[in-house]
Amino acid sequence: MKKSMLNNVIYILKKTWKYERRIIYSLLIQITLGVLLPISGVFLPALVVGSISGGLNCGMVAGVFAILLFLLVINTLSAYLSNMYGTYLLNNKIGFLSDLFRKKMKLDYSYIESPEGQTAYENAFMSILNDYTGISGMLSVISPLISSVIGICINIGIMVRLNILVVAVLIFTSFIHIFIAYLIRAEQEKLQEPVADNSRRLNYLFGYTSGQSGAREIRIFDMYGWIRQNIEGVIKDRINLAKKSAGYKLWLSIADCVILAFREAVAYIAAISAVERGEIEVWELVMYLGTITCASAFFSSFTGNLALLGQRSIEINVIRNFLDKENNECGKKLPPDKDTGLKIELKDVSFKFRKEDEYVLRHVNLTINANQKLAIVGENGAGKSTLVKIICGLYRPTEGKVLVNDVDLNEINIQAYQKLIATAFQDTYLLPMTLGENIAFKDADSSIGEIKECISFTGLDKEKWELNSPVTKMLDADGLVPSGGQMQKIILARVAFKLLFRSAALLILDEPTSAMDAIAEKEFYDRYLDIASGKSCILVSHRMKSTNTCDLIVVMDNGNIAERGTHSELMQLNGLYRNMYELQSSYYQ
């Protein structure tokens, strides 16, 4: 929902007061200095001219030196604030980024994973991180804008005595400038989504080239020229967007120059005419000329910063829209106790990511009884992982429903339900923390014995690693460098910890052993089925021999369940399962 400019300003000031109130103090001082410095520059020349024309005296000289001393003090204070302001902004950014990260971790997984969610997050992240746009940009505009308003009021009070027409011209031209800035801002707003999409593509490519796997592939497959060409293409698109934005700013600058020239011409003609008519003295002329220049600068600052504030408000809306994003309504019923067992039913479940997309799953009907061992097999893209994510509550069915012990999953508290699930996905990552924390997270220090048992269970005890060893060498010089198979064993130890020593009642292994050979995978699955005795299990695999001992095997094909049954039943069908099984078996003969 789009918030007004004033609403966004109040929101940012309240949040900034919470995270780094020294910024608010700095803004108040900057506002004061922003008024006093230009006004002092108006009165000082007039005072000097008046002193000379009227004869020097001690009072006049003292007044001049007092103003000069005052200017020295406030300029020194301004320089100090400028040096410290960057530190204050950094503290403020950390507060807003913390809000953003917390929100991302709580939002629906399906939204975060979608292109829409990724673009919204990228926009919000950059609006917080950038020094010149978003939050920091809005804060940098507030003080000169308020200073301009105060300065305009003071200068109008002086200039009214000269000619009311001059004041009217200043105000009228300011409204023209505001209108032009509004039109240009509307055009710049249209560029926001293309810029965010471009940034996401560029960040992905840069991340790929700097990552370990990308670095290997670029060298092995001689991808340097091709990758560079793609990056240059994305950069070229970004430059074109920047040129378009700069073009809009150029038109605004041209409008500034024309309005400023017209405004000052009218004011100077009025002042000179007043001198010719003998209405003002020379020192007053100097003061009025200074006031005209000062007022014109204040008006330009006001209209320019008001336009910038409008642009910054658009960026703040991006942040607030992400932070205000609501999840799908979550049920309040508690799931069954882990000792009760889980019976999960999928009734005519279909799923697609967006309305305009093709269905990934179509009319899936499946029952997983308590304590049953289920295997899901099929080729890549058959819908296996999507089906698992629906069972986990990460996705909601587009059509149909999921029942847990005969209760609609939409009526169950999803966080409580997910505590009953121990999962290992094929794309799980390690955290830049210790080995123990990667297995037990916050319980690492209080569960040392249990962690060691899980490490032994997965075979990691052979590595002689310490529990407090960091597992990311890129972030810690003393860190470990686990191989692909070792990384998967750490993930499996994490699953074993939740399954054996915490609340898990359902084990889901979604091809987490892809870095292992077929024999090692078979042994691991058998061991996990043993420790999951009395619990429901779902195993997802390409390799048929790893899952042929399960109670039920379903074969996915193009988003549908093509076949189901035990291993022997499926072999007798002489269908898709048998063809895949015999083909894979031939590889090991």
Predicted regions and their residues:
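Extended non-transmembrane interhelical loops and adjacent amphipathic helices
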Residues: M1-I10, L90-S136, N198-L241, S313-D324
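Membrane-integrated ABC transporters
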Residues: M1-L37, M60-A62, L81, Y85, ...
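An intracellular "coupling" helix at the cytosolic face of ABC transporter transmembrane type-1 domains
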Residues: K18-R21, F125-M138, K190-D197, G207-S210, ...
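Transmembrane helix-loop-helix hairpins at lipid-water interfaces of multipass membrane proteins
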Residues: I24-L77, N155-Q188, F262-I269, S273-V282, ...
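ABC-fold ATPase nucleotide-binding domain signature/coupling loops
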Residues: Y121, L460-I490, R494-P512, Y587-Y588
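Cytosolic ends of transmembrane helices, especially the final helix of ABC transmembrane type-1 domains
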Residues: M223, A267, Y288-D324
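Helix-to-loop junction immediately C-terminal to a conserved catalytic motif
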Residues: C392
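C-terminal portion of ABC ATPase nucleotide-binding domains
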Residues: D526, G534, L539, R543, ...
